[in-house]
Amino acid sequence: MIFFRVGLEQNITLPPPPMDDKGEAEEVKIIVANRSAKDVESIRNHDQEPFYAIRKFCEEKGLVFHDGEFDQIIDESVPIISHFKKHFNRDRPVDVDKTINTLPSKTNKTKSYPSGHAAQSRLIAKYVAGKFPEHERELIKAGDEGGYGRVKAGFHYPSDYEAGNLLGEKMYIFMNKADYKKENE
Protein backbone atom coordinates (compact mmCIF):
# COMPACT_ATOMS: atom_id res chain seq x y z
CA MET A 1 0.00 0.00 0.00
CA ILE A 2 1.17 3.50 -0.77
CA PHE A 3 -0.05 6.27 1.54
CA PHE A 4 1.30 9.31 -0.39
CA ARG A 5 1.73 9.82 -4.10
CA VAL A 6 5.11 10.98 -5.39
CA GLY A 7 5.32 14.75 -5.77
CA LEU A 8 2.60 15.49 -3.23
CA GLU A 9 4.73 18.24 -1.67
CA GLN A 10 4.13 20.33 -4.82
CA ASN A 11 0.42 20.53 -3.89
CA ILE A 12 0.97 21.62 -0.29
CA THR A 13 1.85 25.11 0.85
CA LEU A 14 3.16 26.34 4.19
CA PRO A 15 3.66 29.90 5.37
CA PRO A 16 7.29 30.97 5.80
CA PRO A 17 8.74 30.92 9.32
CA PRO A 18 8.85 34.11 11.38
CA MET A 19 11.86 36.32 10.70
CA ASP A 20 12.89 36.86 14.33
CA ASP A 21 14.80 33.67 15.15
CA LYS A 22 16.66 35.34 18.03
CA GLY A 23 13.42 36.46 19.68
CA GLU A 24 11.85 33.06 19.29
CA ALA A 25 15.05 31.41 20.57
CA GLU A 26 14.53 33.40 23.78
CA GLU A 27 11.07 31.82 24.06
CA VAL A 28 12.65 28.39 23.61
CA LYS A 29 15.12 29.09 26.44
CA ILE A 30 12.21 29.84 28.80
CA ILE A 31 10.33 26.71 27.72
CA VAL A 32 13.47 24.56 28.12
CA ALA A 33 14.15 26.02 31.58
CA ASN A 34 10.70 24.89 32.71
CA ARG A 35 10.71 21.32 31.41
CA SER A 36 10.12 18.61 33.99
CA ALA A 37 11.62 15.16 34.52
CA LYS A 38 8.39 13.76 33.03
CA ASP A 39 8.93 15.95 29.95
CA VAL A 40 12.49 14.64 29.58
CA GLU A 41 11.28 11.04 29.72
CA SER A 42 8.61 11.74 27.11
CA ILE A 43 11.11 13.52 24.85
CA ARG A 44 13.42 10.51 25.01
CA ASN A 45 10.56 8.09 24.29
CA HIS A 46 9.52 10.12 21.24
CA ASP A 47 12.99 10.77 19.80
CA GLN A 48 13.00 7.82 17.40
CA GLU A 49 9.25 7.11 17.53
CA PRO A 50 7.30 10.36 16.98
CA PHE A 51 4.02 8.51 17.60
CA TYR A 52 5.11 6.90 20.90
CA ALA A 53 2.26 8.39 23.00
CA ILE A 54 -0.24 7.54 20.27
CA ARG A 55 0.96 3.93 20.16
CA LYS A 56 0.67 3.69 23.95
CA PHE A 57 -2.86 5.14 23.80
CA CYS A 58 -3.84 2.61 21.12
CA GLU A 59 -2.46 -0.24 23.24
CA GLU A 60 -4.37 0.97 26.33
CA LYS A 61 -7.65 1.29 24.40
CA GLY A 62 -7.22 -1.91 22.36
CA LEU A 63 -7.07 -0.03 19.05
CA VAL A 64 -5.35 -2.52 16.76
CA PHE A 65 -3.23 -1.66 13.74
CA HIS A 66 -1.08 -3.87 11.54
CA ASP A 67 2.63 -4.39 12.15
CA GLY A 68 4.59 -1.69 10.37
CA GLU A 69 1.54 0.40 9.47
CA PHE A 70 2.60 3.51 11.43
CA ASP A 71 6.24 3.05 10.45
CA GLN A 72 5.32 3.01 6.76
CA ILE A 73 3.35 6.24 7.14
CA ILE A 74 6.33 7.84 8.87
CA ASP A 75 8.75 6.58 6.20
CA GLU A 76 6.58 7.89 3.38
CA SER A 77 6.18 11.28 5.09
CA VAL A 78 9.94 11.93 5.25
CA PRO A 79 10.44 13.14 1.64
CA ILE A 80 7.53 15.56 1.98
CA ILE A 81 8.80 16.98 5.28
CA SER A 82 12.37 17.10 3.95
CA HIS A 83 11.20 19.13 0.96
CA PHE A 84 9.93 21.88 3.25
CA LYS A 85 12.93 21.74 5.59
CA LYS A 86 15.25 22.23 2.59
CA HIS A 87 13.04 24.95 1.12
CA PHE A 88 12.86 27.06 4.28
CA ASN A 89 16.38 26.14 5.48
CA ARG A 90 15.79 27.49 9.00
CA ASP A 91 18.53 27.01 11.57
CA ARG A 92 17.63 25.26 14.80
CA PRO A 93 17.33 27.35 17.97
CA VAL A 94 20.66 26.09 19.34
CA ASP A 95 22.35 27.27 16.12
CA VAL A 96 21.02 30.76 16.85
CA ASP A 97 21.72 30.69 20.60
CA LYS A 98 24.40 28.24 21.75
CA THR A 99 23.29 28.65 25.40
CA ILE A 100 20.04 26.71 24.86
CA ASN A 101 20.20 23.56 26.99
CA THR A 102 19.16 20.90 24.47
CA LEU A 103 18.73 17.24 25.27
CA PRO A 104 20.60 14.45 23.45
CA SER A 105 18.93 13.25 20.25
CA LYS A 106 19.55 10.97 17.31
CA THR A 107 16.93 12.72 15.18
CA ASN A 108 17.64 16.47 15.29
CA LYS A 109 20.13 16.62 12.42
CA THR A 110 17.99 18.38 9.78
CA LYS A 111 16.81 21.97 9.52
CA SER A 112 14.21 23.28 11.92
CA TYR A 113 11.10 24.39 9.98
CA PRO A 114 8.67 22.69 10.01
CA SER A 115 9.02 20.23 12.88
CA GLY A 116 9.03 16.74 11.41
CA HIS A 117 8.03 15.16 14.72
CA ALA A 118 5.03 17.51 14.98
CA ALA A 119 4.00 16.74 11.40
CA GLN A 120 4.37 12.99 11.84
CA SER A 121 2.68 12.78 15.22
CA ARG A 122 -0.26 14.93 14.01
CA LEU A 123 -0.49 12.80 10.86
CA ILE A 124 -0.61 9.54 12.85
CA ALA A 125 -3.09 11.06 15.33
CA LYS A 126 -5.42 12.06 12.48
CA TYR A 127 -4.99 8.67 10.80
CA VAL A 128 -5.98 6.79 13.95
CA ALA A 129 -8.80 9.26 14.67
CA GLY A 130 -10.10 8.66 11.14
CA LYS A 131 -10.65 5.03 12.12
CA PHE A 132 -11.68 5.73 15.73
CA PRO A 133 -13.26 9.22 15.72
CA GLU A 134 -14.54 8.85 19.28
CA HIS A 135 -10.90 9.15 20.44
CA GLU A 136 -9.86 12.14 18.33
CA ARG A 137 -9.36 14.57 21.23
CA GLU A 138 -7.12 12.17 23.17
CA LEU A 139 -5.19 11.20 20.04
CA ILE A 140 -4.45 14.82 19.14
CA LYS A 141 -3.30 15.38 22.72
CA ALA A 142 -1.00 12.34 22.48
CA GLY A 143 0.33 13.61 19.16
CA ASP A 144 0.94 17.04 20.65
CA GLU A 145 3.02 15.44 23.39
CA GLY A 146 5.41 14.10 20.76
CA GLY A 147 5.43 17.28 18.70
CA TYR A 148 5.67 19.91 21.42
CA GLY A 149 8.25 17.84 23.27
CA ARG A 150 10.68 18.86 20.54
CA VAL A 151 10.25 22.50 21.61
CA LYS A 152 10.75 21.50 25.26
CA ALA A 153 13.91 19.65 24.19
CA GLY A 154 15.26 22.85 22.63
CA PHE A 155 15.26 21.39 19.11
CA HIS A 156 12.50 23.56 17.66
CA TYR A 157 10.87 26.97 17.88
CA PRO A 158 7.15 27.10 18.74
CA SER A 159 6.46 28.20 15.16
CA ASP A 160 8.19 25.04 13.86
CA TYR A 161 5.77 22.99 15.96
CA GLU A 162 2.76 24.95 14.66
CA ALA A 163 3.88 24.57 11.04
CA GLY A 164 4.56 20.87 11.62
CA ASN A 165 1.02 20.39 12.89
CA LEU A 166 -0.31 22.26 9.85
CA LEU A 167 1.75 20.09 7.52
CA GLY A 168 0.52 16.93 9.27
CA GLU A 169 -3.09 18.08 8.84
CA LYS A 170 -2.54 18.81 5.15
CA MET A 171 -0.77 15.52 4.54
CA TYR A 172 -3.68 13.69 6.16
CA ILE A 173 -6.12 15.32 3.74
CA PHE A 174 -4.14 13.98 0.76
CA MET A 175 -3.26 10.57 2.19
CA ASN A 176 -4.59 7.24 0.90
CA LYS A 177 -6.81 6.00 3.72
CA ALA A 178 -7.79 2.66 2.18
CA ASP A 179 -7.85 -0.41 4.41
CA TYR A 180 -4.20 -1.28 5.05
CA LYS A 181 -4.76 -5.04 5.36
CA LYS A 182 -6.86 -5.34 2.21
CA GLU A 183 -4.37 -3.24 0.24
CA ASN A 184 -1.48 -5.47 1.34
CA GLU A 185 -3.11 -8.84 0.60
Where are these regions (language model features)?
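Alpha-helical transmembrane segments that form the membrane-embedded catalytic/substrate-binding core
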Residues: 117-121, 156-185
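Hydrophobic alpha-helical bundle signature of multipass membrane enzymes
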Residues: 1-153, 170, 174
